A protein has these predicted regions:
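Non-catalytic structural scaffold of enzyme domains
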Residues: 1-238
């Protein structure tokens, strides 16, 4: 089968985009440069804030996202991934305007939970307030019989502070401190009955790892990267 070219619609944020590409590289079964997949990246950090658009009637990111998808298609991509969970709120609207298929991060994470940990029926979801409030991730999980626990308002504000601090090149606190806050939120979700934790924002896996948690950790960014490798025609490294 002819390998497909991956298009990454990135910049939301830039470090998450870099991490996504790094995970594609590290999970590709390649022994030489030539055995790696072709990847085209449009990293545009000028995309309007997705959470502001979802919960506060901010500027819609859709026109910029559609333009990015079209640029990727013009450059030769066969399909697109978006390493930003909040941007998936607009996925249907974007998909209606472009011909290339876009992998849904909601779908690939849900499928991974079912295939790898079928016994898990309750998960904790950590993400932006936009992702949590729109409820699309929760609905996708519910269709497959998986219940979702989310943080209360106080804990959710800590998640948002952590996400924006990760995006900040010069944050006022260390990443160790950021990790500590996110671990506390995750532990709170576990105490509410979560048997797994979803990193439902692509910044979160930059600081929160499986070693920090007592339950299975579903890193949406890694799952998306691996799904992209598979769709491109290769089997990712286990």
């Amino acid at each position: 089968m002819k390998e497909k070219t991956i298009g990454i619609l990135g910049g939301m944020g830039p470090e998450a985009t870099l991490d996504c590409y790094s995970r594609i590289i590290s999970s590709t079964p390649a022994k030489t440069d030539q055995e790696h997949l072709r990847v085209i990246i449009d990293s545009n950090p000028k995309v309007p804030d997705r959470t502001a658009a979802i919960i506060a009637a901010g500027q819609s990111p859709v026109p910029v996202l559609v333009a990015g998808c079209r640029a990727l298609q013009q450059a030769g991509a066969d399909f697109i991934i978006i390493p930003c969970v909040s941007a998936h709120f607009f996925l249907d609207e974007i998909q209606q305007q472009i011909a290339l298929p876009i992998l849904s991060i909601f779908d690939v994470v849900t499928e991974t939970i079912i295939s790898d940990h079928p016994q898990i029926k309750t998960v904790g979801l950590m993400g932006t307030t936009g992702t949590i409030n729109c409820g699309l991730f929760q609905k996708r999980l519910a269709v497959k019989g998986i219940e979702t626990r989310v943080a209360d308002e106080t804990q959710q504000s800590k998640v948002m502070e952590a996400i924006y601090d990760i995006k900040n090149s010069q944050p006022a606190r260390s990443r160790t401190q950021i990790t500590s806050d996110l671990v506390a939120v995750a532990d709170g979700l576990i105490s509410k009955g979560a048997r797994g934790i979803i990193a439902g924002c692509t910044e979160i896996p930059l600081v929160l790892k499986q070693e920090h948690l007592s339950v299975p950790y579903f890193d949406a960014l890694t799952i998306l990267a691996r799904a992209a490798i598979f769709k491109a025609g290769l089997t990712p490294i286990p």
